[in-house]
């Protein structure tokens, strides 16, 4: 509620060029507030003859004539102070908003927290479900109407020259597209982009809207931003994270695993050219995040797009090292076997010589000893060649190689290997 300010008892006199006194100013402000909320444009036009359109209204919470002042939301405040246009935008009163703009209301006027009219509209965007195509009951119909009014207000603001790239003065210094990614919908992103919003704008944390959409795994928003030219390989300057790394991190989390979320978002980025082996400032790539999370479908998808399973972080950690950090990963022996088969040289320790925490657990004592022996055992030239062929061509060109190579050789490259075979 950025445009609501709390005032003490000393500052209750109305300010502005007219300097209306006492009950006259209070009554006028209440009437103006009610006219905006009722969308009574005739009354609004008449009241604006006595009240400058860009002058704040001050409403006492004790006022019995203003439904807004009696709202439970504001009971802790003595007065409410806001611009008429901010009130119309926040409560999605399209007719009042248009009337105010036609009478010279400034959409770029900011409240005490540095929010413009557009910022406030986005901060108060209505929450509706995207799972229904048509409303099936009265509640859904009402929510659909609320959403429609919000879109209409947004179009009105844009048509009257609202600055779609204006940053919030405080906090994370979001642009409207960042706010729309957090609070809005993909349609809001599209409307803002149509009106000149910069899709690769960075906020105070150096994140673009695509970074934020990827971080919350919102595929519709990601599709919209990419369609409007968002860079899929732009990195957050403070961390080096790309949209792919953020999406993989969220999808590989416990919540991502439980909800089976994010695979479509990751594939979307990869299909549109995301660099699968891009690394952050710590040298971590998406495959490191995926292996630590241990979610098989994500690891397989990254491998399909030629993720390098031998890439090291700045601390010398390989993807297999990350995978072996967690006991739950190690119990998936089939996935462990596939990763081991692709890893050469097999690097178990980091630059400090430390082993992954998972294989230090007592229950994995025998496995730890076997893996250490395997890491010290040089492979034959034939096995090295097989691993290189598989790592270079991956799953994407698997069927092409099947047509080109003799069946016996192809089977030796792409055949399934169980853990017992690898660790004998």
UniProtKB/Swiss-Prot annotation:
Keywords, ordered alphabetically: ANK repeat, Repeat
InterPro entries per the UniProt record, alphabetical: Ankyrin-SOCS_Box, Ankyrin_rpt, Ankyrin_rpt-contain_sf
Protein's name according to its UniProt entry: Ankyrin repeat domain-containing protein 61
Keyword Repeat carried by entry: yes
GO cellular component, one term: nucleoplasm
Repeat positions for ANK: 80-109, 113-169, 172-201, 205-234, 239-278, 282-311, 315-348
Species of provenance: Bos taurus (Bovine)
Superkingdom of the organism of origin: Eukaryota
PROSITE patterns registered for this protein in UniProt: ANK_REP_REGION, ANK_REPEAT
